[in-house]
């Protein structure tokens, strides 16, 4: 399956091929991104990393930053 990812705040868009039944975690690993500091959004709703993805999904990936 092919999914489109958009990494924020850079707005880098990339199409990647994943195996069927891949999860958001699989996608993050494929992109070499740390799942502990990333939020995956599909259809304007955050999804858990164990959520299965579907062909032609468009996923926004946001780096979670905290400070003090």
List each model region and its residues:
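Ubiquitin-like/PB1-type beta-grasp interaction modules and other compact soluble beta-rich domains
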Residues: 1-67
